Regions:
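Alpha-helical transmembrane segments of multi-pass inner-membrane proteins
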Residues: 21, 112-141, 153-254, 274, ...
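Transmembrane signal-anchor hairpin modules in multi-pass inner-membrane enzymes, especially those
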Residues: 1-83, 105-112, 116, 172-184, ...
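Membrane helix-loop boundary segments at the extracytoplasmic
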Residues: 21-29, 592-595, 629-668
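Hydrophobic transmembrane alpha-helices and their immediate junctions
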Residues: 595-639
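Long extracytoplasmic/lumenal interhelical loops at the membrane interface
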Residues: 531-546, 550, 554, 558-595
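Flexible juxtamembrane loops connecting transmembrane helices in multi-pass membrane enzymes
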Residues: 147, 241-275, 494-505, 509-546, ...
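Aromatic-anchored transmembrane helix interface
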Residues: 60-67, 81-104, 113, 126, ...
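Repeated scaffold domains used in trafficking and secretory/extracellular systems
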Residues: 266-273, 304-312, 345-355, 385-394, ...
Length: 678
């Protein structure tokens, strides 16, 4: 009796930590791992106490063992043994999740409890994510940020986890033969989860979701679901309204009115006024000049898409390209002739051209000042933080970090010399700009200014976050996130705001003249961007894959070790591949690079075995309620994982691989417990 009581207490403890594990998949990796390791610990304690092996064979033992052996050999051969050993340990310690599930879900009732707990909290996480994405939907922030908010984890991880939730719900929706009330409930949950993955704005999760759902349709042979799926994809593609144009507004000093819209060949990025000439940086369309008839003459086809065009001096001009290089041109008889090009040492987030010098702020290498006339580096400061905005004039240089740290330097002969101000604001700073010796800032609640190294509050903030701002005739003109064009007047410490008009589409850039406003606007749909060779995230992936393949060719048997690949990538990449990442955004190439062909074979054996087991379980119970739906959803989730792994290193993502081992263990447990129950 005493033994039974002790075992019951241990079982309740296991159940408690299992609950933490199951309820935190989509919202807290810390709680999730606490739940897993403590549940596993008490399962082992239970086994020692009862003198019974709590674990059962799953059929994955031999491929798991081969994987561990390859990891050990690869670690020994790696030039970063310590790091490889750490990563190996992380991966190996997650493998027992499969066995933890089989040991703790000891009957069908417990299997259902495990799944229902997971899916309930996954749904709650989806609702929370949608609520926090409200501004992204309403104000169109997706087009600016390129992703949804990071609430519980990185948006790309959120999208993959959400795809699993959607696939499970889809499986229950089309497999269960229940009444309409049940179907409606599942459909509502499915729709809400679908909205949450849309809110991530991440194509990897979308791709995996589509693959998993398509696999389920294939397994069920319910071809009539294919048509609506195709219709939705095609309709989404055409409904995304891809466009690029230059818009002309009349301006009488008090309001703007749209006059003309001129479509462009590329993506109208920036508009630049140089003397009486106006230039449009049209991304892949190249550089265009606006003639007197408001028509575009394309005058330069740049080797990579152009983001911005500025004048260096009377004879030199600078084009900033998407790969962050600066391309310098001479102007001769109205024609631009290429002179030279150069780049900052890192991944440029922002730059300013001032007094023939280019000031760049790099994500990974700080501040660099270069002479635009010859590309010579005049100044380098690696800095002590990661900044992404820079502004400069004769007197001051200002840096801003994403967490609203503002640093101000004094200038001497074009070089920053003394730090005058350094402060991290408690509330977000949306934008800062220089005017003489004053730094103006718009925060969430207040407008601030910095003068003589001291910050003060100017006024309350009564407009949405400002995206672009420019000074003309003593006033500041700006575009905010509410699509409004406003004038800001600072007079003796007070601020007045004049609202001059509203844009239908958020401008990317603008130039104001005496009686005219010119804006550039473009929008590219997220689905269409999958096939865009000039999208930075796309060509960065291609560069990573090429480098990863070369790493494999140089280390074919056991790879370079299970390490962060950033340092190696620098050696393999081309000079203008500036974005440095520690993984290769592809499971299969990454595995080849870090573990060689032996590791690739071991992991493909594991994945192939799991795929076979998923099919076996589904085919065994496809006529059963709940069990068949769960097995079908598990198989669909695994297919989703395999497909999304084509563009993401999700095998190495702690949250994702934890989920995969859990689903695998749950499906195996389902098979074993149902078999035991007859």
């Amino acid at each position: 009796m005493q033994e039974d009581k002790t075992v019951k207490i241990i079982d309740y403890v296991i159940l408690f930590f299992s609950f933490l594990f199951l309820g935190s998949f989509t919202n807290s990796i810390f709680i999730n791992q606490v739940g897993y390791y403590f549940a596993l610990l008490f399962i082992l304690i239970r086994g020692v106490y009862t003198r019974k092996n709590p674990f059962i064979k799953t059929g994955l033992e031999i491929p798991f063992l081969l994987f561990i052996i390859v990891e050990i050999i690869s670690t020994i051969l790696s030039y970063k043994t310590d790091q490889a050993a750490t990563n190996m340990l992380k991966r190996v310690l997650l493998l027992p999740i499969v066995y933890f599930v089989t040991a703790s879900a000891w009957d069908l009732k417990r299997v259902k409890f495990f799944f229902n707990t997971y899916i309930t909290f996954a749904f709650i996480s989806a609702v929370i994510y949608i609520v926090n994405s409200y501004d992204y939907f309403i104000k169109g922030l997706f087009q600016i940020t390129g992703s949804g908010p990071g609430i519980f984890q990185y948006p790309i991880t959120t999208s993959i986890l959400a795809s699993f939730t959607i696939i499970f719900l889809f499986a229950f929706l089309i497999h269960e033969k229940r009444d309409w009330k049940y179907k409606l409930l599942v459909f509502v949950a499915f729709s809400i989860a679908l909205l949450s993955i849309i809110a991530t704005y991440k194509r990897t999760g979308w791709l995996g979701m589509a693959a998993g759902m398509s696999f389920i349709i294939l397994m069920k042979r319910k071809w009539f679901y294919i048509l609506p799926l195709v219709i939705i994809i095609v309709a989404s593609f055409f409904a995304e309204k891809n466009y690029s144009n230059v818009r002309f507004f009349s301006f009488d000093g008090n309001k703007i009115e749209l006059q003309t819209i001129l479509n462009t060949e590329g993506r109208a990025s920036s508009v630049t006024k140089i003397d009486d000439e106006v230039y449009i940086s049209d991304y892949e369309g190249g550089l265009a000049e606006l003639n007197n008839n408001k028509q575009l003459n394309y005058i330069e086809d740049t080797p990579m898409p152009i983001l911005d065009f500025q004048r260096v001096n009377d004879s030199l001009y600078s084009a900033w390209l998407v790969d962050t290089r600066f391309r310098i041109y001479k102007k001769d008889n109205e024609k631009f002739i290429f002179s030279h090009e150069f780049a900052s040492p890192g991944l440029t987030e922002d730059y300013r051209l001032f007094n023939q010098n280019i000031y760049t702020i790099d994500k990974d290498s700080g501040l660099t000042v270069m002479n635009a006339k010859n590309g010579q580096r005049l100044y380098r400061n690696p800095l002590d933080d990661i900044y992404y905005k820079v502004d400069v004039n004769d007197s001051l240089l200002v840096l801003r970090s994403r967490d609203s740290r503002i640093v101000v330097y004094s200038m001497s002969k074009g070089i920053p010399v003394n730090k005058l101000y350094d402060q991290k604001f408690a509330k977000k700073i949306h934008i800062d700009w220089l005017d003489g010796t004053t730094v103006y800032m718009q925060g969430e609640a207040k407008f601030h200014k910095i003068e003589n190294g001291k910050a003060s509050i100017l006024s309350d903030n009564k407009i949405d976050p400002i995206l672009h701002i420019s000074k003309r005739k003593g006033s500041f003109y700006a575009v905010d996130l509410a699509n409004e064009f406003v004038r800001l007047n600072f007079d003796k410490g007070s601020l007045t705001i004049d609202r001059l008009g509203t844009f239908k589409s958020l401008p990317y850039d603008f130039q104001l003249f005496d009686d005219m406003l010119i804006t550039t606007t473009y929008k590219q749909g997220r689905i269409a961007s999958i096939f865009d060779p000039y999208l930075p995230s796309n060509f960065v992936r291609v560069s990573l894959w090429k480098a990863g393949w070369q790493m494999f060719l140089d280390h074919p048997l056991f790879g370079v070790g299970d390490i962060d690949l950033a340092e190696l990538y620098i050696k393999y990449k081309s000079p203008y591949d500036k974005e440095i990442q520690g993984h290769l955004h592809n499971n299969y190439i990454h595995i080849l690079a870090i573990l060689g062909i032996t590791g690739f074979i071991a992991i493909m054996w594991i994945l192939g075995k799991i795929f076979y087991l998923n099919l076996k379980v589904y085919n065994k119970f496809k006529d059963k309620e709940f069990i068949g739906s769960l097995a079908l959803g598990a198989a669909g989730c695994f297919v989703s994982f395999l497909v999304s792994g084509l563009t993401e290193w999700n095998f190495g993502d702690h949250e994702i691989i934890t989920m995969i081992w859990f689903i695998t263990g749950l499906n195996i447990t389902l098979y074993l417990r149902k078999k035991e129950a007859g």
